Amino acid sequence: MTFYPPDFTRPLLATGPDARFVPAPADGVLPDGFFSSTNLPTYARVGGKWRMPREPRMDSVIVLDDHDVLWTREMRRVKRGDRVAVGLAEDGREGILVHATAFTGEPAADPEFKFMASEVSREKPIDYSLLADLLLEERDRGGYPVWVCGPALGHSRARNDMVWFIQNGFVGAMLAGNAVAVHDIEASIFGTTLGMTGQGEATSGGHGAHMRAINKVRSSGSIASAVADGTITDGIMHALVTAKIPFVLTGSIRDDGPLPDVITDALVAQDAMRAHAIKATMAILIATALHAIATGNMLPAFVTEEDGSIRELATICVDSAEFVVSKLKDRGTHQAFGVVTNAQDFMHILRLYVERELDQRGTPATT
């Protein structure tokens, strides 16, 4: 979508005050009246000039460092004495502007960043052609598509399609939980997920297959080592390791094992996920409520290109439940395009559309 920059010649913005910065009173403690950031294009006036903070995201603060560079920082990363922007107004009157109409070009009746404002329906048609074009554009420009995946990807036949997207250069990084990797690895070693075959039939003693898969990987030392020694021979994790695509596996309170690569410290996991969210030029969130919302909170609604131009960050959220897609948007990820369908259908149909476009270009998929 086209980016419409703010009109800084407007009287309020042309003659308004600089943003005010107040030192943080202690590590991880913010000054009273701190400005709570959004994921929309945001500007702070410093030295009479409107500037955008680096590494934007919602639910954080704007910090002016010793070199007068603006950064977006999480509360827990703020140190005593850091200069933190204060102010509640988002229209520039306090030196901070949230540009809510950046991609509409039209004045909004109520331009403030808000939660709980979604419109999602399973009756909306899915434009797979557009989604395929977005993926191809990202690959062509050397972008960094971040995929956030839930366990349904492994339970369904979507597993093979995910492997195809990895092998053909459409995945920059994958963020997921322990279960995604466990089910995928179980499928590689035993041909089942949670003891079920690809046809959904239970196998004798299959209830323990995922534990045996975890044990084999722990014996190898890591997922990469299990790929190298032949324990894992196919699947999503095998494709990621083979293609040297980074992944972050985040633990939860209910995890079995977990696998040795899983990050069990929530704050360390946040930092690991954030490192990829900062680089994301597109996000595809499939069949996972918690990981989708967590990642959505880390993503800006826009991408700043190397030449300084700005475009909307395409964010696709796929789930069989309208509730999940609505909740993501209600938590502030307004730019998310909701697709209410199951993971298997979405992945397979999207792959067919991408393959068709590649064939029309005369550059068929390599695998």
What residue spans do the PLM features occupy?
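Gly/Ser/Thr-rich loops at beta-strand to alpha-helix junctions
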Residues: 90-91, 149-156, 179-182, 255, ...
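Active-site histidine-anchored catalytic micro-motif
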Residues: 166, 171-216, 285
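Loop/turn positions that initiate beta-strands
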Residues: 79-87
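Long terminal accessory regions outside catalytic cores
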Residues: 1-70, 74-79
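Gly-rich Lys/Arg/Thr-decorated short loops/hinges at beta-loop-alpha junctions or inter-strand turns
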Residues: 104-119, 141, 214-220
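Short acidic, glycine/serine/threonine-rich loops at helix termini
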Residues: 96-100, 157-161, 184-190, 259-262, ...
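Glycine-rich phosphate/diphosphate-binding loops that line cofactor/substrate pockets in enzymes
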Residues: 129-145, 240, 275-280
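C-terminal functional extensions of proteins
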Residues: 197-198, 203-247, 252-283, 288-367
